Amino acid sequence: MSNLILEKKWTKWYPENISFKNTKKIKKILCSSNNFKKEDFFIDKKNQKDLTFSKETSEINLTQKKAYETGFQTGLLKGKEENTLLKNKLNDLFLNFENSLAKFENELCSQLLKTVLKISSYVIGKKIDIDKQILLNYIKKIINKEGVFLKKPQFIIHPKNKTLIEDIFKKFLNSHKWTIVCDDGIDLNGCKIKSESVDIDATVDARWQQLCRLIYLEEY
């Protein structure tokens, strides 16, 4: 029988999942397998549904897995980019902070130097001629030891010196938010500086003691 005759006689049938309708006569059916008819079989809908469901579930799981991996990689890449940006911002912040801190320290040293010189000149009644660099280095030592930030600083002076001090150091006191406190126990030619972190005694007795100590230690 030629292929042409077969193609005309037979109709192609592609069952997805088939079973015998009459399983009790399966031996008889198998013996006469040459006489199979389409009616002898049926599609197992239940198994077919289970197979379809299983296939769909696998496809869904695979899709979810791919979506998760894609999302994870995307999130990881975005996180790395944001982390890099954050590091750059922090580096810039710390760099600016260090520069500002150094600038503030220099300005504070300069202001303290001027303050000490003016107060010293007022105490002895004439302009003093000293090595400013030595005094500046000493002030820097105090700042490095005690810290550049004075919290709630107070300038303690004798009441009779209040007007004079306010006139001379008004700009400095206002810009650094210092508070003037009057105390009758402070000598006319002295003062004290107090804050939450440090106390500086600049009375005449304290300055003489400090001067003697510096001479003995040969710091000058």
UniProtKB/Swiss-Prot annotation:
It comes from the Bacteria. Its main location: cytoplasm. Keywords: Bacterial flagellum biogenesis, Bacterial flagellum protein export, Cytoplasm, Protein transport, Transport. InterPro entries: Flag_FliH, Flagellar_FliH/T3SS_HrpE, T3SS_Stator/FliH. GO terms for biological process: bacterial-type flagellum organization; bacterial-type flagellum-dependent cell motility; protein transport. One of its GO terms (cellular component) is cytosol. The keyword Protein transport applies. It is found in: Cytoplasm. Needed for flagellar regrowth and assembly. Belongs to the FliH family. This is Flagellar assembly protein FliH. It comes from Buchnera aphidicola subsp. Acyrthosiphon pisum (strain APS).
